[in-house]
Structure formats: C-alpha cells, structure tokens
Amino acid sequence: MKYLNDNIRTLEELKKAYHRLCLKLHPDVGGSDEEMKILNAEYETLFERVKNIHANTDGETYERETTETPEAFQWLIAELLKLDGIEIEIIGCFVWITGDTKPHKERSKALGFRWHSKKCCWYKSPDG
C-alpha cells in the first residue's frame, strides 16, 4: 500500500488515517486526482477487511456489523472538504465539525449532521 498502513486494525483507525491523508491529497487542498484515486482504492480494500471491527474506549476491539459502504464515507469527507472555515475531527465512529459552521448550517443538515447544543458543534453518528 502506498498511503494507508496494512497494520490498521479497526474501522475507526482507517477513517482517521483516510481523513488525515485527504487533507494532503485531495485536489481541493492541493493534491491530485491520481493520488486520490490510489488512496480511495486502498481505502476500499482495507474497508472490506475492517468494516465490522471497532474499538471501545479502552482500546479493546469488538465486532459489530455495519451497513456503511466505503463510498459513503469517502463522499462525506469530500463534501466536507468543500466547506471553508471548518475543522473535521473523527472520534471513534463519530464525525465532528467545528469552526465557522454557521454559513454551512443547511449543508451540514443535508449531510446528516446534527447540532450538539452543549458542545456547540455539528456531529454525525454512525447510524445517521
């Protein structure tokens, strides 16, 4: 593998690594289409291997079936990278967006994000 490490053990690790690499390789942030094609192919391969393997807060792994597809997460990250002034953070199975999110309120809702009033940021849980 050129970009992703074969030692990735869980879906959460894979998503974090993919997001980190998208911030470098996506064409909207200075990367190239060819680099993203390679990264996406690697993501899809590893996704099939770890899609049902998750980690709890103690770092112990467990299995739980998912209906998520690799394309859905790739599409979500690509859409978020188009929004100016936001920070994307992946914590466990959740995707959080912070920063200047107010101009992107309707788009965030359309992408399936919910507003967390106590943390004052948007989040998307694995089940929608």
Could you tell me what each predicted segment is?
Residues 1-5, 45, 49-90:
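Post-J-domain flank of DnaJ/Hsp40 co-chaperones
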Residues 26-28, 51-52, 122-124, 128:
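Short amphipathic alpha-helical segments with coiled-coil-like heptad repeat character
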Residues 30-31, 99:
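Glycine-centered flexibility motif
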